[in-house]
Amino acid sequence: MESVLLSARCTANTATVFWNKPENANADTVYEVSLDGGHSVHTNRTHYTFTELIPNTEYCVTVYNIGSIRICTSPARHRIYVTEEPYNAVGDGKTLNTAALQQAFTDCGPNDEVYFPAGIYLTGALDLHSCMAVYLEKDAVLQGSSDPTDYLPRIWSRFEGTEQECYRSLLNAGQLDHTAGANCENILLYGKGTISGGGHVLAERMIDIERENLREYLAQNAALVATCENDRTIPGRVRGRLINLSNCSRIRITGLTLQNGAAWNVHMLSLIHISEPTRLAL
C-alpha cells in the first residue's frame, strides 16, 4: 500500500478526513471511504466529511488503497442561544443586534459555543477571542450592516502591504503585530449557515467617507493617484473585511457560506495553523 498521509478534523458530531493525492491518481480517480468498516462511500475529492456522529467517541476511518486513521469526536459543547435570555437577539433582518451578540461572544467559554438558530441577525462589527466557538444553524445568517459607523472604532490592519488604520471587519480576531507571534488562538466557526457582509453598498460608503477625509492628501498627490486603478483605490484601503484574522493560531472555519465582504471575505495576517476553507459565494 502506498504511504500517503491522512489527517482529520473533528467536531462533536462531524469528522472530516483529508489525504494527499497519490502520484498515480488523475482527475477521474474515485476514492472509497468507510467508517468503522461499515457501508462505503465514494468521492472524487481528497477529503470526506462524516456527519451525525456521537460526541466524544472514537472511530476508525479507512480510505481504501490509501490508509486508515483513528479519530475521536470532541465532547458536546454547551450552547449559548443568542435568542434567549439575557441576549434576546432578534433574527428579523431589521433589528441591530450588535450589543447582544457581542455579549454572547464575550460570555463564550472554552467548552461553550454561541448558537444561532434560523433567522437573519443584523449586526455591526463583532470581536472574537481565544478558545471559543460559533455555530450557525441551517438558514441562520449573520448579516453585517451597511452602515460604516457600525464598524468603528478603526483598528490597525494591513491592506495590500501597507499597515494603516482600517474599519473593523464583521468578525475580528487578534491584534496585528508583525513583530510578534499569535495573540489569539483556538477559534471554531462552523455549522450550516451563512456569514454575509454589507457588500458593495458598505464598501462604497466607506470609500466615500475616506475620500472626504483624504481630500487634501489626494489633491496634493495627484501624480500618485494617477498611478492607481482609479481615484478610489487609496481611499478603498480602509475597507473592513468579512472576517479579519490577525496574529491568530489554530483557527478552523468549516461548513459555512461566506459572502459579500466589503473587501476580502477572509483576510489572514501573520497566521499559523489555519484549516478547512469553507464555501465562498462569488
What are these regions (language model features)?
Residues 272-282:
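Single conserved hydrophobic/aromatic residue that forms the stacking wall/gate
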Residues 1-115, 122-123, 129-133, 137-246, ...:
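Extracellular "leader-to-stem" segments immediately downstream of a signal peptide or signal-anchor
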